[in-house]
């Protein structure tokens, strides 16, 4: 009963903390023509290729070189099982004028450029180009180079 003497039902009694509804990993892909492919990619849990904390994937946004470096580094780490790669260059001075050594993608960029998988955007000016979009030709070349590097780690290659 409340202060006026009326009966009321407690909303707390119906609320069950043991029951939760899982939110979709990405809520902005519902009507996307590649939804099934995006959901498959999300299941792989590749760093740099996941939905943000607000469950947005932004399927039509261009991928930056910084994000792409994270993706390739994560694949390299997963296949080689060398977790030390993720911190190999931390604490080093950045060789690029447009990338700080404390940037979230710094180690990934250094790992991939040191292995020749990704090129710097402008070697003369010393720029990696982290915010530049990744172009199709760069993707094809870097994936071939990554595949060549990983051949010895994968059976049947």
Question: PLM features: what roles do these ranges have?
Answer:
Residues 1-35, 49-69, 74-106, 119-136, ...:
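Feature responds to low-complexity, polar/acidic, surface-exposed segments characteristic
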